[in-house]
Amino acid sequence: SVSSPDEFFQSGGMKTTAENYPTVETSRQLLMAQARAKVNHFAHTRKLTRTDDQPVVRMNRDTYYSFAVVDVSGGATITLPAVPEGKYISVQPVTEDHRIQPMSYGSGTYQLATHYGKHLYLIVRLDSTFSEEEANALQDAMVIDAGSAEPFRAEPVDKETFVAVENSLRQKLGELVATYGGNVNEG
């Protein structure tokens, strides 16, 4: 297994299929996030998200983001700081097999757990009406408490099949939107 995005694509690696693509792409995203900030630590976007710099698909442009890969194998929590009434803060966990867990809204300490693997990818969103200074102070007040700090590891992947499947799925996107409209991501 590998712990770096630079090692992810290898000849002889696991073949990507349409069925395993969500998990394979999630592994790639976890490795890239872990390269930006070590496990159980945040990588914060200190400015509102630009349309030309989106590490994940369809990020909101009116949101400050913080990302973390958390080892939950020894138990873990995230604490979000207090925000004024009417302001927005949330955390969304994503499992290693790309299951989007229920979001938690507002300040508080939240338990982190997964049904699959040992790690979660956390996406924390902050209201765009905060000034950069306010948002950065809130980001710095976020706390991850984890009983283990093992880095995420993934099986190496064959790049040729990964690219072919990804391109095939992208080509089908127009068809899916035409069929399902705004609900293309549901179900």
Q: Where would I find each of the regions flagged by the language model?
A:
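A compositional/structural signature for long, glycine/proline-rich flexible linkers
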Residues: 2-187
